[in-house]
Amino acid sequence: MTNIESKHGIVSRQPYELYMSFTDLSNLAKMLPEDKKEMVTADMDTLSATVQGFNIGVKVHQRVPYSRIELVDYGAPFAFHVVLHFEPAAENPYHTDFWIMVEADLNLMMKMMLSGKVKEALDKVVDGLVDASNGKMPEGFDVSKWAGQ
């Protein structure tokens, strides 16, 4: 198994607030730019997307309230497990130490091709959440479509 861990980011929201934003996977689809939404289908427990001609999906495996959400592959060409962590930040319990861990069953070639790109994408997600929690929204992001508002 290949293990990939994102950087940790301190999000300026309490763990329960951030956790609740991720409990319904359809919220993630709502945040996408309009030109990407047609490639994604989602409901409370599943999210599927077509990326560069490949279909890949996740479904919720376990929710641990205000602490962790575990996702597993769902119609993907390889097995993987994703864990979103929402822990109180050590220096401020009203902020969240957020990070993502991925465990994937990749052969050596796929590991060499994908590991760096997956790590980079995970770090961008963490950075985006940190920035958004501090009022810096990504270009093209429509706050009115976010269910957490």
Name each model-derived stretch.
Residues M1-T41, Q149:
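Hydrophobic ligand-binding cavity/cleft-lining segments
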Residues I4-S6, F54-G57, F78-V83:
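Short, surface-exposed coil-to-beta transition loops
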Residues L18-F22, L28, L47, V60, ...:
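Hydrophobic pocket/interface hotspot
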Residues A29-K30, E38-P77, G148-Q149:
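Glycine-rich portal/gate segments that line the openings of hydrophobic small-molecule binding cavities
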Residues G75-D127, D131, G140:
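Beta-strand/loop substructures that line and gate deep hydrophobic ligand-binding cavities in soluble
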Residues M137-Q149:
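Short acidic DE-rich linear segments
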